[in-house]
Amino acid sequence: GIQQFWVVFFLFFMTGIAIVLYLNQTPSQPRERDYAYAGSFYAFAIWIGMGVAGIIRLLQHYAKMKELPAAAIVSVACLFVPIQMASQTWDDHDRSGRYVARDFGQNYLMSLQETGNPIIYTNGDNDTFPLWYNQETEGFRTDARTCNLSYLQTDWYIDQMKRPAYDSPSLPITWDRMEYVEGTNEYVPVRPEYKKSIDALYAEAEKQALSGNTEALVNVKKEFGENPYELKNILKYWIRSKNEDLKVIPTDSIVMKVDKEAVRRSGMMIPGDSIPDYMHISLKGKRALYKSELMMLEMLAEANWERPIYIAVSVGPENQLNMGNHFIQEGLTYRFTPFDTDKLGVKIDSEKMYDNLMHKFKFGGIDKPGIYIDENAMRMCHSHRRIFSQLAQQLIREGKKDKAKAALDYAEKMIPAFNVPYDWQNGAVQMAEAYYQLGDSTKADDMMKVLADKAVEYLTWYLSMDDNRFSISTREFEYHWAVLDAEVKIMKKYNSKLAEIYAPKVEELYNLYAERYERLQKMEKK
């Protein structure tokens, strides 16, 4: 009856739509939120069952059928609905033979040093949960600690990080809970304008000390430390100060004294012929550091290079604390080092990275034909292909051509194009260029042809659109045209015969675009 309808209706409404209204979900969610409607699916299933009973009654009433035959016919007919759904979408949901979540999570952990209880900073779901699964369920690399920077802004998560977990000791955080409890030190302003006054204060104190009066110098060093811009002193005398007026960072260029012996013992690659006395951390462009960033500085200061600290390659620059110029890549991770790797021109530890990629990494079955790879897994496949291309280029620069060729061939074997198509943005172009540099023009040409054909296909498709669709797709056309043009330049650079085929297409397609674009502009003015 109508009463039962309203019971099911409100179950349907309150377990789905009402939850979304209550949570006030913002538009453009990072992923589909189907699980918010899980309860509604149960309620709708009740309606489906009631609907089947209703169809049976209709057959009894209008077709004058008995209950059992009517029920049998309706049941068989209704079975075609899930069968049809399964036949059309089974392949989109079939994960059999695919273990990328587990294996790629292990690859992050295998990119860490095997000793020293390393720390890895992550940020998003897809570079955190697979690591947690491997550590919590598989018992893999329980000596390492995964630290999610998104959660590090909260007091409860810092509490967790200060406790040991499995074979990993607590993270090197010395702050008392009252210093990071919610509402405290949520952010600390960066005030480089203070530097002038502080420099003047130290200069005056040193001047008095030269005259025999050392009291002022003793007091100022007692207040702000030997060097007020050194990381440990900033943490101690400014950020953690009891004086609220001093809870600032008085410079946008922090220095950190380097324990050279600890660096030598750490196991990190030492580029160049010396270890710097100080590490420089630039905060230029930042007006404040948030709690998670303060914790990163605290751990860097307290670890003192004795505990390896890494950050996942999937963490964006906005969460790297402007320290990208101190990173050395060892796989799917960047390692924090005291070196300015930009100035030294060394961004990759090729020996460690080669060992990790060639001997330790797993690929979750993506080398097998027919494996279904959704967009999330595909992004990680792209990341793996990119790091292979980066490794190959570094090995070529170091003159290790045999290893570079082996790395490229292994990437082709484990990340094949039939499952992970070549694309301008996923490292395929860099791999093709590396093959050219290694003298394997046949393989390079094969890759470049696929890439160029893909660009031509897109450009031809845009030109086939009607005027309305074409006018809103001009930016995409220009992107793919720029891609094709760049690919042709690479072909010409390495004297590939493919240039003779695709160079005319670059000009031809652009002329067609320019003519049509100009015509549309004139039509708009009219």
Language-model segments: residues:
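ER/secretory pathway lumenal C-terminal domains and tails of membrane proteins involved
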Residues: G1-Y37, F44-N117, F129-K526
